Curated annotation (Swiss-Prot):
<dbReference type="GO" id="GO:0019731">
    <property type="term" value="P:antibacterial humoral response"/>
</dbReference>
<dbReference type="Pfam" id="PF00272">
    <property type="entry name" value="Cecropin"/>
</dbReference>
<dbReference type="InterPro" id="IPR020400">
    <property type="entry name" value="Cecropin_insect"/>
</dbReference>
<keyword id="KW-0929">Antimicrobial</keyword>
<dbReference type="GO" id="GO:0005615">
    <property type="term" value="C:extracellular space"/>
</dbReference>
<feature type="signal peptide">
    <location>
        <begin position="1"/>
        <end position="23"/>
    </location>
</feature>
<protein>
    <recommendedName>
        <fullName>Cecropin</fullName>
    </recommendedName>
</protein>
<keyword id="KW-0391">Immunity</keyword>
<keyword id="KW-0964">Secreted</keyword>
<keyword id="KW-0732">Signal</keyword>
<comment type="similarity">
    <text>Belongs to the cecropin family.</text>
</comment>
<comment type="subunit">
    <text>Monomer.</text>
</comment>
<dbReference type="GO" id="GO:0005576">
    <property type="term" value="C:extracellular region"/>
</dbReference>
<dbReference type="GO" id="GO:0045087">
    <property type="term" value="P:innate immune response"/>
</dbReference>
<dbReference type="InterPro" id="IPR000875">
    <property type="entry name" value="Cecropin"/>
</dbReference>
<feature type="modified residue" description="Arginine amide">
    <location>
        <position position="62"/>
    </location>
</feature>
<keyword id="KW-0399">Innate immunity</keyword>
Length: 63
């Protein structure tokens, strides 16, 4: 029973120390994912602008 308490205590301390050290690593991955999302959004907006301009040109040509 005493061994179980010591094991849980050591596991808890180890989990806390590992989670604090990996926070930077997870933050970097989160920022990369956020950057991909921003690039996708920007590309979609530009694509919609080009499509709208093409539709305007087609409407102008048709009269």
């Amino acid at each position: 029973m005493n061994f179980y308490k010591i094991f849980v205590f050591i596991a808890l301390i180890l989990a806390l120390s590992v989670s604090q050290s990996e926070a930077g690593w997870l933050k970097k991955i989160g920022k990369k994912i956020e950057r991909v999302g921003q690039n996708t959004r920007d590309a979609t907006v530009k694509g919609l602008e080009v499509a709208q301009q093409a539709a305007n040109v087609a409407a102008t040509v048709r009269g």
